[in-house]
């Protein structure tokens, strides 16, 4: 599988190309006198060190690129790697089934949970079917239906956030996009079961918040969370999307900044080079975080859970 190196990773890409070339030569002619294995090992060590150096000093715009990486794991990847017995549930029981949001019942270490998350799609046909991860009102109403079901059966709710934003099409507006988002915000604040939200890629505006009100809010190390995309912000402030890197830095969209502002609880470390380099390791880290969060929330009564969530919401913003 291609790693799809980003622009700032080009020095790493060049080293990896050399490694691939030497490995191919070695396979073609095993009778070569020179010791290719030794050189390949040296280059691999150099690639790891270079990756560490580059990723130790990433800017907000580079993190935004990683959050959108075409090979980055999506909700269904984490469902497959970290959960068991997933049974997908479909439809909002009012209009349609929005494929941009997936949800269903699964087991996390044997415990039944309700999973809800954005799903972008990888190949062209799937991207179109999933609407590039941009939900319509029926997607948010499906999510709310599943949340209410989870509450009835006393199941914790786990959401995965990864969207550029809610779909802004005319049809979505006609069917009540803003109402669907607002209703989810209100109802999520009232749920009597634990709610754990994790930003796994892009956390885009109200489209993200509509499944993002929880008792615990986590972000993967190279994910973003913002009210608008860097390109959108740059287009408004500087009349040019070319200023997106400047906007990304100014907006404070990355996990460390949001944790500093107490908008999120935890940052889940990613494998060296990002989650797409090792989805299995990323899923294991995410699973450990979810289990730790559930253990904390299990100690609270329903009244304590609701009061804590209310206090959390009231603490947002500057005094």
UniProtKB/Swiss-Prot annotation:
What's its EC? Answer: 2.1.3.15
Tell me where in this chain the CoA carboxyltransferase C-terminal domain is found.
35-296
Q: Which InterPro entries match?
A: Acetyl_CoA_COase_a_su, ClpP/crotonase-like_dom_sf, COA_CT_C
The similarity annotation says: Belongs to the AccA family.
What this protein is reported to do is described as:
Component of the acetyl coenzyme A carboxylase (ACC) complex. First, biotin carboxylase catalyzes the carboxylation of biotin on its carrier protein (BCCP) and then the CO(2) group is transferred by the carboxyltransferase to acetyl-CoA to form malonyl-CoA.
Whom does it interact with, and what assembly results? Answer: Acetyl-CoA carboxylase is a heterohexamer composed of biotin carboxyl carrier protein (AccB), biotin carboxylase (AccC) and two subunits each of ACCase subunit alpha (AccA) and ACCase subunit beta (AccD).
Known NCBIfam families for this protein?
accA (TIGR00513), AccA_sub (NF041504), PRK05724.1 (NF004344)
Q: What is the protein name given in its UniProt record?
A: Acetyl-coenzyme A carboxylase carboxyl transferase subunit alpha
What is the protein's species of origin? Answer: Klebsiella pneumoniae subsp. pneumoniae (strain ATCC 700721 / MGH 78578)
